[in-house]
Amino acid sequence: MPKRTFTKDDIRKFAEEENVRYLRLQFTDILGTIKNVEVPVSQLEKVLDNEMMFDGSSIEGFVRIEESDMYLHPDLDTWVIFPWTAGQGKVARLICDVYKTDGTPFEGDPRANLKRVLKEMEDLGFTDFNLGPEPEFFLFKLDEKGEPTLELNDDGGYFDLAPTDLGENCRRDIVLELEDMGFDIEASHHEVAPGQHEIDFKYADAVTACDNIQTFKLVVKTIARKHNLHATFMPKPLFGVNGSGMHFNVSLFKGKENAFFDPNTEMGLTETAYQFTAGVLKNARGFTAVCNPLVNSYKRLVPGYEAPCYIAWSGKNRSPLIRVPSSRGLSTRIEVRSVDPAANPYMALAAILEAGLDGIKNKLKVPEPVNQNIYEMNREEREAVGIQDLPSTLYTALKAMRENEVIKKALGNHIYNQFINSKSIEWDYYRTQVSEWERDQYMKQY
């Protein structure tokens, strides 16, 4: 989606010309959930003057009730009209930053926090941090009450075509809606698991790319519903098949120059690229809870399902955490393969960027690339070459996060503490549950 710049007068003009009747002021909470305040277009001037207030105490991880007043400051460049709204008037969306009553950015706003980390990047001489995400999702049928079932929409596989891929019509409509909203769609296809799909859209600067991910999720769920399907970004909804990932392809720029590219080295990579990679590898255990935030996330990060379990990097090999795709020049990038689509994109990207900057600032040395299939190596072989495991549960991921000062810096005290507290409660709740699997295994035997 190309970067656009709008003024207040532009917004007024668009609202009138398009017969906009409602405005959705959108923001994202710490858990990655999209929130919005909907107001009639008669409130447009208050919106443009940053005067729209909401109760922050009602949002997960924001503030206590005695300090709850928050203001929404819209980013005018995020103006878009939802294509599926018409009839009595259209609905327009503006993504907002959250501000406190004293006029300063709220430290618990993930979008504002990402901007803070980007400022740190700029202080090191870089101008842009670009992200190209690869989000995957499943489509399940709805029952007669409109509730999701476990019945898949098809039994297709990787890149399968119709008639096997019965979700093709839904996926096509999603692509059309996204294009109407300004997305530059690069690929759309069936993924490995039945009912699993991937739609890739063009990279963008860090904040815009994260905005696009949140918009993408909303569009996918909305259009799926119109096809009597439920779209889920749950990382591992089914046993025995691949889970859904959201690989992050990232690159640093200095002006128009890709800071990761050097045509005169063996792999075409700069020392900056190696240092950034080293920082990501060093801090990977610490940011795993942010990039894989659900109990369910760790059902995906197991051997045998094309998801990374081990902390290593390679140029071609897809089994490590980090891969360096073969494209060079302006397209030079590193691919962080552990991220799943349940992650808050603003927080995940802030953590990965801070980890990479840690490598650059401290001139960390990257280990040797691993070009063999790590899944086929035993523990002794992995340990011999210094390959660590990613955390295998949310509990161990939170433990690693508590021990990592770089990730604490990436998120800031407020988000860091609120996230750990919320996720610790989630883990404790899960830990005390009794599952159907346990009853099936033990009820009769004991």
UniProtKB/Swiss-Prot annotation:
GO terms for cellular component: cytoplasm. Mg(2+) 2 binds at E136, E191, E198. PROSITE patterns: GLNA_1 (PS00180), GLNA_ATP (PS00181), GS_BETA_GRASP (PS51986), GS_CATALYTIC (PS51987). ATP binds at E186, S251, R318, R323. Its cofactor is Mg(2+). One of its GO terms (biological process) is glutamine biosynthetic process. It comes from the Bacteria. It catalyses: L-glutamate + NH4(+) + ATP = L-glutamine + ADP + phosphate + H(+). NCBIfam families: GlnA. This is Glutamine synthetase. It comes from Staphylococcus aureus (strain MW2). The gene is glnA.
